[in-house]
């Protein structure tokens, strides 16, 4: 569950501008503020089921956006490559060819 929450938070960060205000509000309250479905329903004066349905549809939309735009995947790959590059730089013996390959891989992501 924590892994899903983390993923949804990342997807929300990347794609929230593509969502409606209501979708942003529900997702923010549910995932960022950790409110329950019932608490969100009470705040918006709708049923718990309406909140649940909206959040599930929004989650599916975020996954669809990621499938098409792969912003999160590229971000994670960049993070991995930057960490590897930092490790290589910090080592006593610099492996120039390997560092060049990492830099090229980062450049290809953008």
UniProtKB/Swiss-Prot annotation:
Classification via InterPro entries: RNA_pol_sigma_r3/r4-like, UPF0122, UPF0122_fam_protein, WH-like_DNA-bd_sf
Source organism phylogeny: Bacteria, Bacillati, Bacillota, Bacilli, Bacillales
Gene3D superfamilies: Winged helix-like DNA-binding domain superfamily/Winged helix DNA-binding domain
HAMAP family cross-referenced by the UniProt entry: UPF0122
Protein name: UPF0122 protein BC_3844
Organism: Bacillus cereus (strain ATCC 14579 / DSM 31 / CCUG 7414 / JCM 2152 / NBRC 15305 / NCIMB 9373 / NCTC 2599 / NRRL B-3711)
Annotated family: Belongs to the UPF0122 family.
NCBIfam families: PRK00118.1-4, PRK00118.1-6, YlxM
Entry function: Might take part in the signal recognition particle (SRP) pathway. This is inferred from the conservation of its genetic proximity to ftsY/ffh. May be a regulatory protein.
């Amino acid at each position: 569950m924590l892994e899903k929450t983390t993923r949804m938070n990342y997807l929300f960060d990347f794609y929230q501008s593509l969502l409606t205000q209501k979708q942003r509000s529900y997702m923010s309250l549910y995932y960022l503020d950790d409110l329950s479905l019932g608490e969100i329903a009470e705040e918006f004066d709708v049923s718990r089921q309406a909140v649940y349905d909206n959040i599930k549809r929004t989650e599916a939309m975020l996954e669809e956006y990621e499938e098409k735009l792969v912003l999160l995947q590229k971000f994670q790959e960049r993070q991995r490559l930057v960490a590897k590059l930092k490790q290589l730089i910090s080592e006593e013996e610099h492996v120039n060819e390997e560092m060049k390959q990492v830099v090229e891989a980062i450049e290809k992501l953008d």
